[in-house]
Amino acid sequence: MKRERINPDTLELDERVVLINRVSKVVKGGRRFSFSTVVVVGDGKGHVGIGMGKAAEVPDAIRKGAEAAKRNLIRVPLVHSTIPHEIVTKFAATKVMLRPAAPGTGVIAGRGVRPVVEAAGIKDLLSKVYGSNNPVNVVKATFKALSEMTSLQEMARRRDMTPQELNARRMRRETTEAA
């Protein structure tokens, strides 16, 4: 399935720096330091992108990361203020579980998951990170999970139901679990 290109110029994107890491290269004269960054951009209305930048100076690395993130935008299907369904995704040694939450719950997430889901505009979400909690891999696993998310309409079409039937069924299941 080919991903549609999203034009970042049509969106009001906010940048968030998730990680700034100083890395060194050992050369004959000593160590050469450079910086790598992970940047998340999003409009808070269902669009989010992640990017990595590397440069000799921090501002240049952040700028490169932001440019990469704008080239890597995806659309995330939202249901009210949460995601349409639970998803578990693995990236490298990191496994991320994202679950929809009731309105008012807030974003219950760690340092790598929170900036990605908040940039996408998700207000209510439960998450858990299993395995490696390396921030780069957590951000990439979260982004992968959001990119694999399917909309309520798509899920209903696959099951030969209307979105209203599917949502009613889901609500019944959630109320019986709460009781």
From Swiss-Prot:
Residues 160-179 are annotated as: Disordered. The N-terminal domain interacts with the head of the 30S subunit; the C-terminal domain interacts with the body and contacts protein S4. The interaction surface between S4 and S5 is involved in control of translational fidelity. The keyword RNA-binding applies. One of its GO terms (biological process) is translation. With S4 and S12 plays an important role in translational accuracy. Part of the 30S ribosomal subunit. Contacts proteins S4 and S8. PANTHER family: MITOCHONDRIAL RIBOSOMAL PROTEIN S5 (PTHR48277:SF1). Keywords: Ribonucleoprotein, Ribosomal protein, RNA-binding, rRNA-binding. It comes from Chloroflexus aggregans (strain MD-66 / DSM 9485). It comes from the Bacteria. SUPFAM superfamilies: dsRNA-binding domain-like, Ribosomal protein S5 domain 2-like. GO terms for molecular function: rRNA binding; structural constituent of ribosome. The lineage of its organism: Bacteria, Bacillati, Chloroflexota, Chloroflexia, Chloroflexales. Residues 13-76 form the S5 DRBM domain. This is Small ribosomal subunit protein uS5. GO terms for cellular component: small ribosomal subunit. PROSITE patterns: RIBOSOMAL_S5 (PS00585), S5_DSRBD (PS50881). InterPro entries: Ribosomal_Su5_D2-typ_SF (IPR020568), Ribosomal_uS5 (IPR000851), Ribosomal_uS5_bac-type (IPR005712), Ribosomal_uS5_C (IPR005324), Ribosomal_uS5_N (IPR013810), Ribosomal_uS5_N_CS (IPR018192), Ribsml_uS5_D2-typ_fold_subgr (IPR014721). Belongs to the universal ribosomal protein uS5 family.
